Amino acid sequence: MFQFEIQATCSNTGARCGCFHTPHGPVTTPRFMPVGTLGTVKGVTTSQLAETGAQMVLSNTYHLHLQPGEEIVADAGGLHRFMGWDGPMLTDSGGFQVFSLGDLNRIDDEGVDFRNPRNGSRILLTPERSMQIQMRLGADVAMAFDQCPPYPATENDVAEACRRTHAWLGRCADAHQRDDQALFGIVQGGCFPHLRDLSARTVASFNLPGIAIGGVSVGEPVEEMHQIVRQVTPLLPADRPRYLMGIGTLREMAVAVANGIDMFDCVLPTRLGRHGTALVGGERWNLRNARFRHDHTPLDPNCPCIACRQHTRAYLHHLIRSEELLGLTLLSIHNLTHLIRFTTAMGQAIRDGCFSEDFAPWEPSSRAHHTW
């Protein structure tokens, strides 16, 4: 039911393109995945989302458990029917969000005891409970419950998080009982090479349908993140999709693809859109800026999205300055389209044998007149 086929590789780098087959359709790689935390990609309908080229969409176990609750989603027929999305979906375990909360009472080998920010009640989230919730939600891919250490953290603290993550992965694997849902493990280890090595080898030993690299983009220097990717990917099975969590900038995705990463997710495109910022080439444009007031050209002539096809920079500037919701929606659609087209273009370049020339190393200034 879940199969990953590699269709082409780059002879000069570790880049590869392929297809991850799921019960709700294929996911071509490399692939950027929009984040729909609460069963919605903020400000965008599912029809608009489909027009961006999105294939797989993420939702958040922690947030959906709090509101509306996995029972309501299950009663609707699962997350796909609940939100009206018939393509592949992935749910993260909720671990990152729980560990990001300030009001934690207990983290131990059993799980995490925390206070519900909505009503103050106590919640115990364990590997088994995370699997129960994710199985009820019914996404194509469920992520294992892991402990993501903060940055910076001591070696002892990161080692303890690794030990706990590996033990919890075993419990997740035992508790996960849906054949139509793939379980992905998560590599931790912070910025300590020997711990990343240990975690990669341990998670790979579970022989799961896919593996993610977690604990990146949490405040560490960018070059350290690059080094983690370079170190970890050769230790992961070549015939499984590799997912770098929380990454969504062009340069970081290009560097990661050059080192064998297949999948990405990030809230960045919609967050920027909601703040009036557009991604164009390798730049971020603040559409509030007065320089766009009389600019009646498309936002990006190379982009096929509705914002670029039907509207001008001056109109988008007007919407943002007027605080019209349409402006935020149009910029979110554009930014999503931009990142998805970028990963699609990397895949095509791998097939065409020109990835190393066009994307690795990739710098924004060299791609100002892009054609993707």
UniProtKB/Swiss-Prot annotation:
Domain of life, per UniProt, equals: Bacteria
Q: Corresponding gene?
A: tgt
Q: Where does Zn(2+) bind?
A: 303, 305, 308, 334
Function comment: Catalyzes the base-exchange of a guanine (G) residue with the queuine precursor 7-aminomethyl-7-deazaguanine (PreQ1) at position 34 (anticodon wobble position) in tRNAs with GU(N) anticodons (tRNA-Asp, -Asn, -His and -Tyr). Catalysis occurs through a double-displacement mechanism. The nucleophile active site attacks the C1' of nucleotide 34 to detach the guanine base from the RNA, forming a covalent enzyme-RNA intermediate. The proton acceptor active site deprotonates the incoming PreQ1, allowing a nucleophilic attack on the C1' of the ribose to form the product.
Q: What is the originating organism of this protein?
A: Synechococcus sp. (strain CC9311)
Please list the GO biological process terms of this entry.
queuosine biosynthetic process; tRNA wobble guanine modification; tRNA-guanine transglycosylation
* Known partners and oligomeric status: Homodimer. Within each dimer, one monomer is responsible for RNA recognition and catalysis, while the other monomer binds to the replacement base PreQ1.
Kindly give the SUPFAM superfamilies that the UniProt entry links to this protein. Answer: tRNA-guanine transglycosylase (SSF51713)
List its EC numbers: 2.4.2.29
Q: Which InterPro entries does the record associate with it?
A: ArchSynthase1/Queuine_TRR (IPR050076), TGT (IPR004803), TGT-like_sf (IPR036511), tRNA_ribo_trans-like (IPR002616)
State the similarity comment. Belongs to the queuine tRNA-ribosyltransferase family.
Q: Please state what class of enzyme this protein is.
A: transferase
- Region of interest called RNA binding, as start-end residue ranges on this chain: 246-252, 270-274
| Pathway annotation | tRNA modification; tRNA-queuosine biosynthesis
Classification lineage: Bacteria, Bacillati, Cyanobacteriota, Cyanophyceae, Synechococcales
Q: What is this protein called?
A: Queuine tRNA-ribosyltransferase
Pfam families named in the record: TGT (PF01702)
* Assigned keywords, A-Z: Glycosyltransferase, Metal-binding, Queuosine biosynthesis, Transferase, tRNA processing, Zinc
